[in-house]
Amino acid sequence: MASPEQAFFSYPNPVNEVVARVTAGGVVLIGLVAIAAQLPWLSIVLAAGFLLRVLAGPRLSPLALLASRVIVPRLPLKPKPVAGPPKRFAQLIGLVFSVAAALLFFAFDAETAAYVVLGALVFAATLESVFGVCLGCHAFAGLMRLGVIPPEVCESCNDIWAHRPKPAPVVPGS
């Protein structure tokens, strides 16, 4: 049985994809403001948010709490449970990108490179938020297929395509 600390610092499984997409929308907004207004310190805000979500899911992240407790309950959408481990992996990738941007800004004074990294993060978060395409989840599935991530990490998500709705069969003459 998990200790209270282990339970607190665990990632939910499953997660509500609607909350994940709204949270990604918040990342898009923060990233766009950072780029458009040239506010490099927002890369640290993004990194802190990703770190909190990697450590404890939405429990500590102000952005995820806003999404899960304020925004999503007011939307006319049903919860959509999806596997948690790929989403956590995607949060880890977001952490890597946001930390890389912060380091490029503040440790290496490489603004252009930092804004390119932030732009890539905004692009990936836009795909998740607008289209429901989680690049980190696809990478997770690929790493599972290659055997880098063992199947027991997420037995239900080894093949993310198996969980997609199948198109309705075409009936001739209809």
Predicted regions and their residues:
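Membrane-interfacial helix-loop segments of redox and metal-homeostasis proteins
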Residues: M1-G173
